[in-house]
Regions:
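Non-catalytic interfacial helical region
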Residues: 2-131
């Protein structure tokens, strides 16, 4: 099962993702978190399954599209993650539209949380700040 969270409001997106993780966890699962700072070998190992004893896991993949090697492996593994019994959570704070659409195509749940746009400062001091 694949869950996808994205958007510029990272605090809200993370909060909603953590709520969903808490909802589906039964207490005995191990949480595996892979970020762009991990190695490709770590990511590959997380795709292999629960190991010798069939340990149930929740896998969180965070910001992998920032790392070029991991990005390629992520896109090649989407179908495998979609069919998996283990829940996979993908959190991408900022990703391009093509990557977002590709991940959404395989996701059972897609959630986007964008921060409200800030109004442009039209005050008299804006000119002084520009100098």
């Amino acid at each position: 099962m694949l869950y996808f969270y994205t958007g510029t409001d990272t605090k809200k997106a993370r909060g909603e993702m953590n709520k969903e993780i808490a909802r589906i966890s039964k207490g005995g699962e191990r949480v595996v978190r892979i970020t762009d700072a991990n190695s490709v070998a770590d990511f590959t190992a997380s795709l292999q399954g629960g190991g010798l004893f069939g340990e149930r896991r929740i896998v969180i993949l965070e910001g992998l599209s920032e790392n070029e090697e991991m990005r390629d492996l992520l896109f090649r593994s989407l179908a495998q993650m979609q069919k998996s019994e283990e829940p996979f959570f993908i959190f991408e704070p900022s990703t391009d539209a093509d990557a977002r659409r590709t991940i959404e195509k395989y996701s059972a749940s897609k959630n986007r949380f964008d921060a409200p746009k800030k109004e442009k400062d039209n005050s008299v001091f804006a000119l002084a700040n520009a100098l």
